[in-house]
A protein has these predicted regions:
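Thiamine diphosphate
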Residues: 1-129, 133, 137-158, 163-210
């Protein structure tokens, strides 16, 4: 498996800004970013906003940004990718790190996942191709990740377009860094939800999402 600290070391060399929407497949990488990435890190509200922030950062620093997301968030990212970052518009280099939920294996079999990830998983690579974005697929077996990531950054800068790194399940190893110790909050997630539920008036309509 890939060491997140090694991965972030490469990010530090080529980028000074990371933003995105957290994904469970990327959690071992993301848990190390705050303690080891030297640039700015912003957790965004949605993938489209992330692309916008990445564009703004590049225009001010001339260094390509990194945007992370789950493949389900590609739909939200499409508009700014093709209406702003595209080579026919402002031609903005950046590296997308995309967690591949519902991934399809090399033997064409699909890994079992939640129902909402089935079609998305099957269509992820075709969607990236249709956006005319160069990409690499990595897994826990990927060798020489330094070269893979360096090549992707340099290509993005050369062609002045976004490039993507598609991440399979179990790619990054879990570390127990002192810099990334869990923060102690007064309320757990479950207790917070319980408080919200008990405060909602009866017969209220509640809309929620993942």
């Amino acid at each position: 498996m890939i060491d997140p600290k090694l991965f972030i070391k490469i990010l530090n060399k080529y980028s000074n800004f990371i933003t995105g929407v957290p994904d469970s497949l990327l959690k071992n990488l993301l848990s190390e970013i705050d303690g080891n990435f030297r640039g700015k890190h912003i957790i965004s509200t949605n993938e489209g906003s992330s692309i916008g922030l990445a564009i703004g950062s590049y225009l001010s620093s001339r260094k390509p940004s990194v945007v992370y997301m789950q493949n389900a968030g590609l739909g939200n990212a499409i508009n700014p990718l093709i209406s702003l970052a595209d080579k026919n518009v402002y031609s903005i280099p950046m590296v997308l790190i995309i967690g591949w939920r519902g991934e399809v294996l090399s033997n064409a079999k699909q890994i079992k996942d939640e129902p909402q990830h089935v079609s998305q998983g099957k269509n992820t690579i075709n969607l990236i191709k249709n956006l005319n974005i160069s990409y690499k697929i990595i897994s826990g077996k990927t060798k020489n990740i330094e070269y893979v990531l360096k090549t992707l950054f340099l290509k993005s800068l050369k062609i002045n377009k976004p490039c993507a790194l598609v991440v399979r399940k179990n790619t990054f190893k879990k570390l127990f860094s002192k810099k990334t110790q869990k923060k102690k909050f007064v309320l757990s997630r479950e207790k917070a939800i319980e408080k919200i539920i008990t405060s909602i008036p009866k017969n209220s309509i509640v809309v929620s999402t993942t």
